[in-house]
Amino acid sequence: MLSLYEGFFSGGARIVHSDVLLGLVEGGRQRHRVLSLHSEVHRETTAQHMRDDPCYRSLTGAGIDITSLGRTAPLTDGTLAASAFTGPELADTARALAGADVILSLKEQPLALLNQAGLPRRPIVVCLHRSDPENQGPALDALRTAIADGKVVACVCCADSTRDAYAAAGIPADLLHVIPNGVDLLRFRPDPVARLAFRRSLGIPATAPVVVFAARYAPMKNVPLFLRAARTWLAREPTGHVVMCGAGMTEANGALRAEVTDRVHLLGVRRDMEAVYAGSDVVALTSSSGEAAPLCLIEGMMCDAVPVTTDVGDSASIVAGHGIVTPADPAAIVTAWSAAVTHRAHYTATLPRARERFSRTRMIASYAALLDTVTTETRDELRPGLSG
């Protein structure tokens, strides 16, 4: 199996896909490699090098070979930096494809490369992680082209909202398979020791209410809405604290510098999100579009942080019975945060019975079954030769 990544940078889709690869390799029945189009990307006001990325390190640490075409360019949502590829890039890609039985494309952006003429023809499984295909620039057209050419044999949707959105965009329904996101339940769990240690590291009292916002600094996340709600909530909650983490959530971001106080903590990208969530009372999401199955809601909820989210993607069904869905209104969000803090014990009481639904094990088993089926059904159909 060969996975194509647009690049290694902070984001839930890369975390999920990398975790799936780790699980499939652990199973021992499949061999996986990764080809990354970019070795460094510039987005969310940060330069993110492949070799510094936690997903890259986890994959290589597990023995998964990762190569790159070496591109370095700014990226915007849904847009590959260029759809023109050099001769050496195509040659490197051809060598990588030649050794694979099945190609996994992390989102539709890498299809701009896979649609190039003369590359080895292999069955492609496209892993979709958004609910707004129309906002993916030329990537949606690249997906349509690959499907029309007969190379795409399945699309994995991480949420029902993803399936519905792509079906509405004209993607054949029989290609769309829903495999909901899952997380490592041994890692993401309530942890009183980690809770106290995290709070102590930031000077937050043990009894103070804490809201965490785990997101990259991007328009779809509606950071301004979160900040308006945070200012009002902090004014009402004199002991409250707000934690913001993710790519671009640092004082180096001029748009956030003025927000910093002794009760607003900008942490940037963290590798210990289980501790961040365990140390929080509420995990907030204020996104306006694009979300499918937000990883922050699942991870936070599994650590006993009450999810409070706008109604985007599958968020409402994910938090049903365990959190609060709000309109995109600061006053409503503030009220919901306070209610979540006050009634936290109520919202977390039924979580033990719901944990299996969000299991990484369940997710990986579903991917393995689909890939086994694809391999069996297409082994000879799309491999007429290296120049297909």
PLM features per residue range, with description:
Residues 35-44, 183, 214, 218, ...:
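Glycosyltransferase donor-sugar binding loop
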Residues 105-111, 128:
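Short His-centered aromatic/hydrophobic patch
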Residues 52-54, 189-204, 348-349:
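A short helix/loop element that forms part of the nucleotide-sugar donor recognition site in Leloir-type
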Residues 161, 182:
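Carbohydrate-associated surface elements
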Residues 14-22, 209, 213-232, 365:
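A conserved mid-protein helix/loop that constitutes part of the nucleotide-sugar donor-binding site
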Residues 65-66, 253-270:
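Nucleotide-activated donor-binding/catalytic signature segment of Leloir-type glycosyltransferases, i.e.
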Residues 321-331, 339-344:
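Conserved acidic donor-binding segment of nucleotide-sugar-dependent glycosyltransferases
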Residues 305-309:
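Short hydrophobic beta-strand element within catalytic cores of glycosyltransferases
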